[in-house]
A protein has these predicted regions:
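Alpha-helical transmembrane-bundle signature of multi-pass membrane transport and export proteins
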Residues: 1-262
């Protein structure tokens, strides 16, 4: 995760510099060529483990069992809803090109730098979590971090200064990292070993569906009411729906693992 976040900081900033210096087509070409190293690494990999036992479960039956378990385990279901709603309504990242050009008035390089904000916040939050060790009262911290994510997104939509926008975007990344760590750990702790893969599959529906559908929602709202309104309303709805989840799922709100989680 740390390597991925560092790459997310360096990549957009470097892309912004390259686009400003050379033709954007060459930037895409360089990106395509870079995948050659990944393909080569995959070709060089050799698996030396034992052959896995054949899976005798039926696909649809296994999926239904995973959905049934996830829904009946109310704490896990609450984390799924938080994940989906936050990513569905807070799709500020897709608006960055317009925000960079029309709101904070920076060029291509400024856009690339602004794109690194969430990753910088994620790295800082990850370092703090690692330094502090155990997180207590995980349910409260989870709900608070998602609410902070929504508030940061809301004010990001109102900001017109580049540095303030960057700070708020970084704050949203930090809050998202804290909530992601807690959500993921809670799910693993509460899921039996034989259902963990199916629960993860259900989680991927929420994890992948929220951002993709959210981009469509944000685009429709932005086209009708403008980009700032789309971002602000998304952040506000995230905060309100987090409050609803806190009220609707008291067990999630009160959740605390016996020894804390990291």
């Amino acid at each position: 995760t740390l390597v991925w976040q560092i790459a997310s900081v360096i990549g957009p900033a470097l892309a912004g510099l390259m686009v400003a210096a050379i033709n954007i087509g060459w930037v895409y070409a360089a990106n395509a060529i870079s995948f050659g190293a990944v393909i080569l690494a995959l070709l060089l990999m050799r698996y030396r483990g034992r052959t896995a036992a054949p899976n005798t479960g039926l696909g649809w039956q296994a999926m239904a069992e995973g959905l049934r378990f996830t829904y009946n385990q109310r704490i896990i279901w609450g984390t799924m809803l938080l994940d989906f709603m936050a990513t569905f309504f807070s799709s500020a990242r897709m608006m960055l090109p317009i925000i960079a050009s029309d709101v904070v008035h920076v060029g291509v390089w400024g856009y690339g730098l602004l794109s690194t904000g969430q990753s910088v916040g994620s790295i800082v939050a990850g370092a703090i979590i690692s330094y502090r060790g155990e997180i207590k009262r995980q349910g409260h911290v989870l709900l608070l971090s998602v609410a902070i994510y929504g508030v940061a997104t809301l004010f990001f939509g109102l900001a017109t200064n580049f540095y303030l926008s960057y700070a708020l975007f970084a704050l949203s990344g930090a809050a998202d990292t804290v909530s992601t760590v807690i959500r993921g750990t809670i799910r693993q702790l509460l899921t039996p070993d034989h259902l963990r893969g199916r629960m993860t599959g259900v989680n991927m529906i929420f994890f992948m569906g929220g951002p993709q559908l959210g981009e469509m929602e944000a685009g429709l709202v932005a086209s009708a009411f403008g980009v700032p309104f789309a971002v602000v309303s998304g952040g506000l709805l995230t905060v309100l729906l987090t409050g609803w989840v806190a009220w609707r799922y008291p067990k999630l709100r009160a959740y605390e693992a016996e020894h804390g989680i990291i």
